[in-house]
A protein has these predicted regions:
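Short terminal targeting/anchoring segments
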Residues: 1-24
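Terminal low-complexity, intrinsically disordered regions
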Residues: 1-2, 185-187
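Stable alpha-helical elements in mature extracytoplasmic
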Residues: 19-22, 26, 30, 73-76, ...
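Short secondary-structure junctions
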Residues: 33-40, 87-88
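Short edge beta-strands and adjacent turn/loop segments
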Residues: 40-55
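Periplasmic OmpA-like peptidoglycan-binding domain that tethers envelope proteins to the cell wall
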Residues: 63-76, 85-86, 98-186
Length: 187
């Protein structure tokens, strides 16, 4: 039955390649839309265990807020939800909120832990509202403790204020295969 295993492996590679190109297609169209409007670009990249979508906080939220603020953000999350629905069953999404090193000025959040976790939860709630199975999602927060850029300039702080969606396979044996198929899809 090694032929069956090869068939299954080929099918799962085709599925993953389709998932990757679906993501890339969605991101290309969103990036074009955002680029035309002058908004900062959403990034999509490989990670050690799968892939990551990085969303600038100012696309999603007003300063020091965790309330999703605009139609572009809601539309993008709706598209992400449609893509998540097509992922293999063992792939989950961890939504992580990040902030810069400055403490929130609003009284709603006493610190960056509260702000970054509230932002991650807002994104997860929206994805669930858009039809994603809650079992495929987690929300977590890093506050200011995983900066993407320097916190010494406004430009750097802006890059640090973000929400990341990490897609990983729960099947440990598949992690290397998932990453390989993601890399293969880029060629």
């Amino acid at each position: 039955s090694s032929e069956q295993n090869q068939d299954d492996h080929a099918t799962s590679n085709k599925e993953r390649t389709g998932v990757k190109s679906n993501f890339e297609q969605t991101l290309r169209s969103i990036n074009e839309l955002l680029h035309a409007s002058g908004s900062p670009e959403i990034t999509f990249e490989e990670s050690e265990s799968g892939f990551v979508i990085r969303l600038p906080a100012n696309l999603l939220f007003a300063k020091d807020s965790a309330k999703l603020q605009n139609d572009d953000a809601l539309l993008f999350l709706k598209r992400i939800a449609m893509v998540i629905a097509k992922l293999p069953p063992d792939v989950v999404a961890n939504v992580i909120g990040h902030t810069d090193s400055e403490q929130p000025a609003s009284t709603e959040f006493k610190d960056n832990w509260q702000l970054s976790s509230a932002r991650a939860i807002s994104v997860v709630s929206e994805l669930i509202k858009d039809g994603v199975d809650p079992k495929k999602l987690t929300a977590s927060a890093k506050a200011e403790f995983e900066p993407f850029a320097t916190n010494f300039t406004e430009q750097g702080r802006e890059k640090n204020r973000r929400v990341e969606i990490h897609f990983v396979s729960l099947n440990l044996d598949d992690k290397a295969k998932t990453q390989k198929s993601i890399l293969d899809a880029q060629e």
